Amino acid sequence: MAEKIIETAYAKINLGLSILGKRKDGYHEVSMIMQSVGLCDEVIITEGEGIQISTNLEGLTCGKDNLAYKAAALLAEKYNITPNVHIILNKKIFMAAGLAGGSSDAAAVLRGLNKYWNLNLGDDTLETLAAELGSDVPFCICGGSAIAKGRGEIIVPLPDMPETIVVLAKLRNLDVS
């Protein structure tokens, strides 16, 4: 077990989104072009008791409803691990802005705990686990440029986008996710 793992959780934007219909499971069938951006959170994993979450962002739930907590609980359950971790979320991604802040943190927790617990899981396995947590989480495992299909769980990598300056704005009282 490592002493401390630090993972970067990059925000993502949708460059294109097509809603292709409603699925039997209640989700929408989509085709999206997704792109990681430089805005990111930092996820630090250290020893703790059970699953502890702390954050620098006031108002963010740190309990069992937090997606990072759910990611840790899922991985511990699937691989029969008694979790003793403290997960610190240093948030810079805006909440409810459609930038996958929670999803990217959950993906970073999966990647980080994979290392912390020496599970040696491949990206495909992590993406499959990520799909149990949410539609954006599988993309956030590897990030970059990709097409996401299905409900977002089918990831088809694209060539890297050239470096581009993007300005993101979020109105204070408008939640988009």
Feature locations, PLM:
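ATP-dependent small-molecule kinase catalytic core of the GHMP/sugar-kinase superfamily
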Residues: A2-T8, K12, G16-S18, K22-M32, ...
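N-terminal beta-alpha supersecondary unit
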Residues: E3-P83, A96
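DPxDG-like acidic metal-binding loop motif
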Residues: A68, A97-D123, F139
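Phosphate-handling active-site elements
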Residues: A76-H86, G112-A131
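Membrane-embedded alpha-helical segments that form the functional core of polytopic membrane enzymes
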Residues: I87-M95
